[in-house]
Amino acid sequence: GVNHTNFIKKMWYQRSLSIPSDWNSKKILLHFGAVDYTAEIYIDGRLISVHHGGSSPFSIDISHITKPGSTHNLVVSVSDDIHSGLQASGKQSHQPNSFACFYTRVTGIWQTVWMEAISPYGLKSAETYPNIDQNQLVITPQFYQIANDQTLEITIYDDQKKIAQLTSKCANGDKLILPIKKMKLWSPETPFLYDITYQVKNAEGQVIDEVKSYVGMRKVHIANGMFYLNNEPYFQRLVMHQGYYPEGIWTAPSDEALKNDISLSKAAGFNGARLHQKVFEERFHYWADKLGFITWEEFPSWGMSSYAELASRNFLSEWMEVMERDRD
């Protein structure tokens, strides 16, 4: 946010947006990690997008209204009224001061904003499903566009050693199966992660897009009233994490602060956390994967009127965006 904790119903951001000259023929995306609450995005005075939801990410394709080698005027208008009953505000106080379990308010851009240039035929997403019972990883890719004879090559590494590879013709929604021999499981005690490289290639075999990621092979299910991890009963010792920071309220002061939250929790004997009434930054989940930490994510649903249809619409659409971001 803007480090101003009063009730702010309207605010504006403005800055110049310089497009590198070597971004010709690229799809240019403008990403917002989270803006509380309704964001209107303008470029050169033209409204190009509106997003409702203070905790979910959104991206805008600005290729058609920007020009490589030029500078544009970017304006973000934010509306935030936690008294309306139409928006989820979590533990933000509806009174001037904090009280009970309601704390300092957040308004405006509170997560990372960045711009990137990608191939128009690049990989849009890849949903991973670890099937430890069959010793395999199932990957479902989506692409921005698909050209004739375009292929996707997926390579899985165990500590820089190639252990599986698959090449397939690009198709949205295909389920691609890679066998994992001598599989290493992920758990809080042994948080092993496999590295994955995705390469999209054109008809000539040239790499037009490359994405590097990771995956943990693990299974979670409930049976006989018990929680199971990797087919074994598992006792969760969870801390309740509210994600408030003196320096930035909802915004962590640094990546190290997010990592330290998990390190301190594990040192105290906890193996996971209930993330209470807040959608945490993606980097928090990254460190949870790397360090071995179970997370139960909870939407900041407080503040909505149960009688307002618009509040339900706002909640459901935003929650789906959060689920899409954190589904793996």
Language-model-derived ranges and their functions:
Residues 3-122, 146, 279-282, 293-296:
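Accessory beta-strand-rich segments of carbohydrate-active enzymes
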Residues 10-18, 27-29, 57, 71-73, ...:
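Intrinsic-disorder/low-complexity, polar/charged segments enriched in Ser/Thr/Lys/Arg/Asp/Glu/Gln
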Residues 42-48, 157-159, 230:
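Short strand-turn-strand beta-turns centered on an Asx-Gly dipeptide
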Residues 48-49, 163, 234:
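Short hydrophobic beta-strand segments in globular cytosolic domains
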Residues 49, 187, 271-275:
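Short catalytic-loop micro-motif centered on adjacent basic/acidic residues
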Residues 55-63, 83-88, 93-94, 103, ...:
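Active-site mouth of glycoside hydrolases
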Residues 67-71, 142-223:
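Extended acidic/polar, glycine-enriched regions
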Residues 117-147:
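Surface beta-strand/loop "capping" patches
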